[in-house]
Amino acid sequence: MNHFELFGLPPQFSLDGSLLSSQFRELQKRFHPDNFATASERDRLLAVQKAAQINDAYQVLKNPISRAEYLLSQNGLEIRGEQQTMQDPMFLMEQMELREELEEIPHGSDAESALAAFDARVSKMYKQHLASIEQELNDAQWPQAADRVRKLKFIAKLKNEIELVEEKLFG
């Protein structure tokens, strides 16, 4: 049973987050190991395994990057944990320039506004890539979707770096 089947969801990138959460809570309740306290040792072990499977599946499906990676793996393209280098020099150059720009923001005269504008740009880029991934997955364009996921990972890392700069600037 795959993660989508476990939650009773269609195997697609776009999903209803609130439905996923409610299904997760329902499955958690149903298979919570405490419910099997008086059951046989075998049934208790199965309940623990099922609870772990439910938790793992939820973690994968709730995150758009891991959800896309999972969909790709379900279609024969395993990119989770891969060490393949990015083959798009223009994208890599853009990422380097964005990181350099982020490094300069704290030293500028209006760091707060500059960081907010920078964050908005990167968030827009992130959303555009998510939309492209959804389309590529819907169209079964697996290699293109895989490349887009690799790029989205770079952008997600940049978003995390923005948060770190924000914490340093504003505590």
Curated annotation (Swiss-Prot):
PROSITE patterns per the UniProt record, alphabetical: DNAJ_2
Recorded superkingdom: Bacteria
Single GO molecular function: protein-folding chaperone binding
Disulfide-bonded cysteines: none
J domain mapped to chain residues: 2-74
Family per record: Belongs to the HscB family.
Protein name according to UniProt: Co-chaperone protein HscB homolog
Name of encoding gene: hscB
